[in-house]
Amino acid sequence: MWNLRITPLSFGAACQGIFTSTLLLSALTVPLVCTIVYDSCLYMDINASRALANVYDLPDDFFPKIDDLVRDAKDALEPYWKSDSIKKHVLIATHFVDLIEDFWQTTQGMHEIAESLRAVIPPTTAPVPTGYLIQHEEAEEIPLGDLFKHQEERIVSFQPDYPITARIHAHLKAYAKINEESLDRARRLLWWHYNCLLWGEANVTNYISRLRTWLSTPEKYRGRDAPTIEAITRPIQVAQGGRKTSSGTRKPRGLEPRRRKVKTTFVYGRRRSKSRERRAPSPQRAGSPLPRSSSSHHRSPSPRK
């Protein structure tokens, strides 16, 4: 963290401030590479790519504060760090955790120094209008080494004899604003990647889609509460945990020959199996009664007798 000592002399403060701003500009501004849409080089699914782009449209108060976000991200990344995972979401989320931690405190320090410079700015000095300050979209097109020069030219075009201390204040406010917008995009991307590790990319994609639908629906036609990712993933977890596991082992198929099904037919009132061997035909004519034995000629005594 760097400190800018303010001296009572305007010239001393101005010279020291300009020297500090030009030398440390490359170390104080967030790398603009984090603001570029990079999902094309990550080989994302088309639905996940659209959901990631839609993260930028979500309201600012939807995301946690910087401190809470970094803490939650570290908790989610800790198991992957221990196993030295090289998953896509792990690598990118780790990059944004480091970037946000490094530049968030620096940006806050730039605001504090800019506010402290007000004491040495002449009270009659008018602030530089927003149109003369470099915006985030313009900073993406300007080389980092030329950023200070471009901003200085705009201040001179606004007022050629603008006080030097006020110029330093304008520079710091412009750079802090660029950093804040870059950190906001980095914060949204960090939220996306570490939630993909917690819930799965498909579930986060589905959640973003439902949330945007809920936000775009008029209030009187939508539910009172916004959808949550816990509610979306809960049915899947219940279905997986509710399956009953059988204690026995299932008999494998195809290892034993299938038993041939026995077909039976009825021939003149007698049941005969086709699979059995057929007996030799009887000399009796088919359908004639069987001859009785000699003992069967005697009539059995009547039960009345």
Curated annotation (Swiss-Prot):
Q: What Pfam families is this protein classified in? A: Hepatitis_core (PF00906)
Top-rank lineage group of the source organism: Viruses
Compartmental location: Secreted
- What keywords would UniProt list here? Host-virus interaction, Secreted, Signal, Viral immunoevasion
Q: Where is the signal peptide?
A: 1-19
* Residues of the propeptide: 273-305
Q: Does the keyword Hydrolase apply?
A: no
Molecular function GO terms recorded? structural molecule activity
List residue numbers at the site (Cleavage). Answer: R272, S273
Q: Basic residues compositional bias: what residue ranges?
A: 258-277, 295-305
Q: Which GO terms describe its cellular component?
A: extracellular region
Assembly behavior: Homodimerizes.
**Function in brief:** May regulate immune response to the intracellular capsid in acting as a T-cell tolerogen, by having an immunoregulatory effect which prevents destruction of infected cells by cytotoxic T-cells.
Q: What is the designated name of this protein?
A: External core antigen
